[in-house]
From Swiss-Prot:
Residues 3-63 form the HTH tetR-type domain. GO terms for molecular function: DNA-binding transcription factor activity; metal ion binding; transcription cis-regulatory region binding. Residues 26-45 bind DNA. Mg(2+) binds at H100. This is Tetracycline repressor protein class G. Signal peptide: none annotated. It comes from Vibrio anguillarum (Listonella anguillarum). SUPFAM superfamilies: Homeodomain-like, Tetracyclin repressor-like, C-terminal domain.
Length: 210
């Protein structure tokens, strides 16, 4: 019989998530996976919502390797590396962005958040704008991964035509084909670089008035 501790339940939950997706993940299926009776799960998670709240933290612990700035790191480099690492973590599991969306920081995450905020403040951001910048990047990552994972799910539909094939003009046909060739990574990096460039202009304007 599987030793049922919280870590074992979460690990099995992540495996099941990859197999069936968020909508089809149930405590009944999880109990079957663990070869236990469903009530045994309630010692650790009272319901599916409680389980889903725990999965994002496990994803980030496992895959988000750049949540903290390195010594003497440029703030722009940190924001980009942090975002790329966060994106990798969400993409590593099916419906990763959907599960993460709407979650709030828990006590173990407060130390990381404070370190990030203090780092940006030392680089010329006021505390409020440091939080806004971090939130903007986080929301951009989650939103883009939501779109990407939804698109990946659509592509599994048989005989689904490419967008470029449906374009009404040759201009759009060529453009859409180029965008599809470039892929999601190029589009994501463009948006992220644009965000960070905007933060730099706002930061410079504030420093110029001090």
């Amino acid at each position: 019989m599987t030793k049922l501790d919280k870590g074992t339940v979460i690990a099995a939950g992540l495996e099941l998530l990859n197999e069936v997706g968020m909508d089809s993940l149930t405590t009944r299926k999880l109990a079957e996976r663990l070869k236990v009776q469903q009530p045994a799960l309630y010692w650790h998670f009272q319901n599916k919502r409680a389980l889903l709240d725990a999965l994002p933290e496990a994803m980030l612990r496992e895959r988000h390797t750049r949540s903290l700035p390195e010594e003497n790191e440029d703030w722009r480099v940190f924001l980009k590396e942090n975002a790329l690492s966060f994106r990798t973590a969400l993409l590593s599991y099916r419906d990763g962005a959907r599960i993460h969306a709407g979650t709030r920081p828990t006590e173990p995450n407060f130390g990381t958040a404070e370190t990030q905020i203090r780092f940006l403040c030392a680089e010329g951001f006021c505390p409020k704008r440091a939080v806004w910048a971090l939130r903007a990047v986080s929301h951009y990552v989650v939103g883009s991964v939501l779109e990407q994972q939804a698109s990946d799910a659509d592509e599994r539909v048989p005989d689904r035509p490419d967008v470029s094939e449906q374009a009404p003009s040759s201009f759009l046909h060529v453009l859409f084909h180029e965008l599809e060739t470039d892929g999601m990574d190029a589009a994501f990096n463009f948006g992220l670089d644009s965000l960070i460039a905007g933060f730099e202009r706002l930061r410079a304007a504030v420093l110029a008035t001090d």
